[in-house]
Amino acid sequence: MEQLQPPSPYTYNRRQTRDSEEHAEALGEWDQVYDQLSPGAFEGSLVDIWFEGLQVFRETTNRSVSQSGTTWNGCYVVGIPVNMKGPGLFSKQVLTRDSMLTFHSDQEFSLTAPEGFDVVAVAVPEKTLMEAMQPGSSEELYQLFPKSPKVMVAAPGQLDELRNCLLSILDPASFEPELLAYPQVQKAISSAIIGHLAEVLTSATQAPLPTRSFKGRCHVVKEATNYALTHTTEPITVADLCEKLNISRRMLNYCFQDVLSTNPVHYLRSLRLNGVRRELRQPGNIPGSIRDIACKWGFWHLPRFASEYRALFGELPSETARNSRN
């Protein structure tokens, strides 16, 4: 009788989240910031599995969120939407359900996800991908699979096969994670994922590039956002942004509407409210510090601030602070 091999190490994490920042922190070995953009209580879920050097995960978010960050060193990431209520924006490129996002750990990514965003993804060591795709050199691999964040398209059948392969592993109703204790199971699943991934990437092409005018509007939005977030101690106004970027109020509004389907006042207020929320969630806050934090982020009318905060997050600032202390 063949002797069973000893159990192989793996990790399995399944979580339900009630806060965008909590959700960002839940994904192992990623350094991320999430900002909630659409109003209402946040609900998210995450299934995160590590085995055979791979990270496979599925995450869902019910609210539109802005995401940015980096992942663990030396890996490529491929993400495939499962469901989404409208298109997303990945590093100035439109993301749909029929496309996939890709990037290397050397590069920071940015994603504006719509409401009802459900995505499966795999992070693969570069060496593993090299062995599977067998390019002649790293340069050839980078031509097939650029390091910079890209939206790619592939044959629908191949993309569906990879998506379904990942879903079959990440669905708690159909997969028992304890099976990963068997090295044979790990090897079989890893081989299936890498095989589908190599097929998809070999035939994938970059999605149609946005027009120069759209890229220009994305640049305006990014510059406006960066300026506002680096001047949190100042009550930045739309007029300030127009002066800084040397554009008209009408053009600034048009850029935000076209890229993010919102206006600059609403978007920048949402980012500031998220900044307040992150500070309120820090342990050690004392009663009365809510006013200080709100003023720090430029909110001077406290009743209006509390109303806007509750409209975005579904709870009052005092509730956030109280929950963080508990």
Regions found by a protein language model. Name each.
Residues 1-41, 87-232, 237-239, 243-249, ...:
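Alpha-helical bundle regulatory/interaction domains
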Residues 22-25, 41-63:
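A short glycine-rich, His/Asp/Glu-containing loop-to-beta-strand
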Residues 52-54, 61-89:
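Glycine- and acidic-residue-biased ligand/ion/polar-headgroup-sensing regions
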Residues 217-221, 268-273:
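Generic hydrophobic, amphipathic alpha-helix propensity
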Residues 242-254, 258-259, 269-275:
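Active/binding-pocket-proximal capping segment
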Residues 252, 256, 304-305, 309:
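Short hydrophobic/aromatic patch on the recognition helix
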Residues 258-259, 311-312, 323:
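Alpha-helical DNA-recognition elements
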